[in-house]
Amino acid sequence: MKYDHIIIGAGSAGSILATRLSEDPNKSVLLLEAGPDYPEIDTLPEEVKYGYATGTEITTSEHNWQFTARGTDDAEILVPRGKVTGGSSAINGQIFLRGIPQDYDNWAEMGNDEWSYQQLVPYFNKVETDTTYQDDPGDFHGADGPIICHRFPRDTWLPATHAFEKAILDAGYPYCEDANAPGSTGVGPLPLNNPNGIRWSTAIGYLGLSRHRLNLTIRPDVSVKRILFDTTGNHPEATGVEVVSGEETFVIEGSEIILSAGAIASPQILMLSGIGNSSHLSEHGIPTIKHLEGVGQNLADHPMLYVTWITKPEVDLDAMKPRIQITLRYTAEGSDLENDMIVYCVAATGDRPERG
């Protein structure tokens, strides 16, 4: 069988693409995922269903690729990537915070106006059901999208959360009611996509809407070795994928091949397929299909620093309570990048809680 669309990776992007493309009943869609699939919320493993992406239960999980990188010459750092339907949205910290408008506008200035903040706002809204603003979503919130977003009301805040807010306000920072509004800065409730404590991944939000469709085939536990190309013309054309399922290798044909395997695996698959720096490919015995020096280069990620205090004995640090409820966004002194700093108050420690 030749599929109309083959999607490599059922993660944050792939699950959405599969759902949207399969809306056309005349198109066949194959969604490939290297990790397992859990069709029902009740069947999700605990570390996928709950958690904050920081405990050993997720960093050592079989649902995490457990990639490492060298932050310095002397130390390795973890690079968590999801290996399950939902991808990294199934193992993340559920912080549903939009990017800075300036960043999107900078992308637009590079040549594509469609990436400006104003152009993207309708798509931000389309993704979400923001329960805080569901009755009056206005211009900057969604009321009927697949991903559920909420904020903890003030009367549910923990003592440490109240203390954090007071300290920030006393330091002169403003209060921010809505951190997802354009131009927002200061301290206030943090938008989260974990209603009732459940990590609301794209596997739940999007594949939950589409997995019943007869024109959508979801194949978990299938690893893609490479994309296949027809090189007889002037420009290489992707025609299929070579995959491993069980211990067998298969070739699957498709009219369109969509690579959405994440920030690490997507360039890896491209290079294994012959797309990348030709000198680097030749070192590994891979024939070059297309020389592109940037593939697998220039990855940037945000650093994080933990500062820990021991609280007074009378302070409630019940591990079953929510950990992160509010946040501070601000601009570092001397920086020309708006809101380039963010601070969370992690209000509890202990075993992974099932928390709302």
Task: List the model feature ranges, each with a label.
Residues M1-G356:
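N-terminal redox-cofactor-binding region of secreted/periplasmic oxidoreductases
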